Amino acid sequence: MPRTTRSAAVTAATAVAFAVALTGTADADADATAVTAIPARTAPQPVYWDAPPQGVAVAAPQRLLNQPVRITNDFAKRPTTQCLDVDANGGGNGTVVQIWQCNGTTQQRWYLWNNGALESYRFPGKCLDADLGGGGRNGTKVQIWDCNNTPQQSWSHPSGDRAIYNARFYSGGNTVMDRDANVVGNGARVQLWQKNFQSQQWWDVWAD
């Protein structure tokens, strides 16, 4: 991805080292289908990462953390704590990703990989994906799709930044993941939108 406003020199190895510091070990050979329980933590810890720039491949995709992460949205008008959630009634390509009250369920957990992928815990082998048909324009759908190690499935959440960026539609840091501000409760659409520094574009990622 073109990095015109921040350094492009963050390597996959650096990202691994940073993320591992949160939990002590990285699980290089873990199989998402073999996981049967979400490990509990005593206190949530924030997680930040820089994905490899577009066109820079990682040596071997692997998970950065042993346990899945939880992604919360800090929309100022939210009625309660809200999480990034995949529709549990779906699971196929194109399944909706939405905002929902945090409830500790598997559809609100994601495995972070060193290529920037966020794999659904509920639907192993499906990754958070920006719809190519939207072209990165305002309203581009965020969905799940077969994990395929492509830039539209590579995300970053740099330290000191509230936003989550997509590698395919980075736009010099001007396009970010956004929740529909017109829906304050469950079911708000998750999409790409021009960065506007408003709270619907503020996210926290937690290892807990």
Regions found by a protein language model. Give the residues of each.
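Short, exposed beta-strand-loop hairpins at the edges of beta-sheets
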Residues: 180-182, 191-197
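Secretory targeting and sorting signals
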Residues: 1-32
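Short coil/turn segments at the loop-to-beta-strand junctions that recur within blades
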Residues: 103-106, 148-151, 195-199
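Aromatic-rich beta-strand patches that line glycan-recognition/binding surfaces
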Residues: 95-101, 140-146, 188-194
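Extracellular glycan-recognition/adhesion modules and their associated mucin-like linkers
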Residues: 2, 29-91, 106-136, 154-184, ...
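Residue-level signal for beta-strand positions within conserved beta-sheet cores that form or flank
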Residues: 93-95, 137-140, 151, 186-188, ...
